């Protein structure tokens, strides 16, 4: 008899399609100064406040409504009239924390998100359940870069042997690099993928939100296959039914995560240092996710920070890996050097993408991007003082081949974003 209980159902289904937490702060700041907020006021005020910090063009009018809805469920604002909302005591307290104690502000926001959505704890638990033998590492596939897939006419929706071969080779490559990262039966994968690919092709092409005749419209097989892969992998791995245990975590089908919501939750949970992800690992065709936190009955290690308000359905507390510098110094420096050398050997150029180095060091050491920045800053200062036998150079330039990655999370040291790193041994 299974004694594991269901997860508490969320009070709000459907996360807002934004990932910038400073939108909460700015909306509350407007509510405090103006005495209220509504959609029209946010549309006018927020773009001016976040210009240079957020891609303003990416904030749609729907996002403003999502923002109001979430702030209401968090208890930070309350409805006063048909369209106007006023800041609450809890909202004032959170706004104050944003100014004087950012760590506590993050804690408060995470606690509210857990209460409302349940997703933070559930998502981390699901990663561990999907790949318990390899530290919760999971891959959402994308077609291999060397796959040659030509464009087709929109109406040509045939699933070919070539698509089957590419789809199988893609997941086998990922599983070869990281064991257990894709717990999906191959034959079922191909069947589900074919159905989704053809479903996408059955839809009419659109331009500027309008359907257009498909007679002269071409489409990219790679793009359609990529979207189909991501859609069905997210549906399989992050639905209310656990694909490994075949048991339900929630009763309501609205708890199934969509690909769109998945793309929001990944950066949100990374911002909370619960997990990391990357779309740019050269060895992995797709998005690689891995937790940097885990659920435990108890903990005696000083390298972990507890979050008592984050519990799984077995009532275990979530602990985030937060090692201190003195405890991880040697491992960090050694790993940084090894990862840099691996990239250098493959690319044979001195300056390597700092984002690529960051992603792999974080994966190997299970540390957050924030800790990586702190530890890199310390290591850089040690190199300047010749306390290590290596010189480290950091550059803010962006190479031409890095333009497509400009929207990736940056690496910041002392408030400056760096994009390239070079490491050379000091010969005595």
Task: Annotate each language-model stretch with its function.
Residues 272-276, 282-314, 385-428:
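C-terminal engagement modules used by replication, chromatin/transcription, nuclear envelope/ESCRT
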Residues 134, 379, 397-401:
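Short alpha-helical linear motifs
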């Amino acid at each position: 008899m299974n004694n594991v209980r269901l997860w508490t159902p969320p009070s709000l289904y459907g996360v807002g399609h934004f990932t910038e937490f400073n939108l909460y702060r700015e909306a509350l700041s407007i509510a405090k100064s103006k005495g209220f907020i509504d959609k029209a006021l946010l549309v006018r005020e927020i773009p001016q406040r976040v210009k240079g910090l957020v891609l303003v063009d990416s904030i749609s009018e729907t996002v403003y409504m999502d923002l109001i809805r979430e702030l209401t469920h968090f208890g930070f604002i309350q409805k006063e009239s048909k369209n106007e909302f006023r800041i609450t005591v809890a909202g004032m307290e959170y706004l104050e924390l944003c100014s004087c104690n950012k760590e506590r502000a993050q804690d408060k926001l995470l606690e509210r998100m857990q209460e409302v959505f349940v997703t933070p704890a559930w998502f981390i638990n699901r990663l561990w359940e999907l790949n318990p033998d390899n530290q919760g590492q999971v891959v959402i596939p994308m077609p291999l870069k060397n796959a040659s897939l030509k464009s087709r006419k929109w109406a040509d929706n045939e699933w070919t042997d070539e698509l089957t071969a590419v789809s199988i080779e893609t997941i086998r490559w990922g599983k070869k690099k990281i064991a257990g990262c894709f717990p999906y039966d191959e034959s079922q994968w191909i069947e589900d993928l074919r159905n989704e690919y053809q479903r996408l092709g059955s839809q009419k092409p659109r331009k500027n939100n309008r359907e257009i005749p498909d007679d002269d419209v071409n489409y990219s097989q790679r793009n359609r296959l990529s979207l189909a892969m991501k859609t069905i992998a997210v549906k399989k791995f992050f639905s209310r039914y656990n694909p490994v245990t075949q048991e339900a975590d929630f009763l309501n089908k609205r708890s199934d995560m969509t690909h769109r919501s998945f793309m929001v939750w990944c950066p949100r949970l990374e911002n909370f240092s619960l997990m990391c992800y990357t779309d740019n690992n050269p060895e992995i065709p797709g998005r690689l996710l891995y937790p940097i936190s885990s659920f435990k009955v108890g903990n005696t290690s000083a390298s972990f920070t507890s979050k008592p308000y984050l519990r799984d359905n077995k009532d275990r507390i979530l602990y985030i890996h937060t090692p201190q510098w003195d405890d991880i110094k040697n491992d960090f420096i050694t790993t940084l050097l090894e990862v840099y050398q691996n990239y250098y050997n493959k690319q044979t150029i001195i300056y390597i993408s700092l984002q690529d180095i960051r992603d792999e060091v974080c994966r190997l050491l299970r540390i957050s991007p924030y800790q990586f920045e702190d530890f890199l800053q310390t290591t850089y200062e040690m190199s300047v003082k010749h306390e290590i036998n290596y010189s480290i150079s950091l550059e803010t330039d962006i190479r031409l081949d890095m333009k497509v990655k400009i929207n990736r999370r940056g690496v910041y040291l002392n408030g400056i974003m760096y994009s390239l790193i070079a490491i050379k041994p000091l010969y005595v």
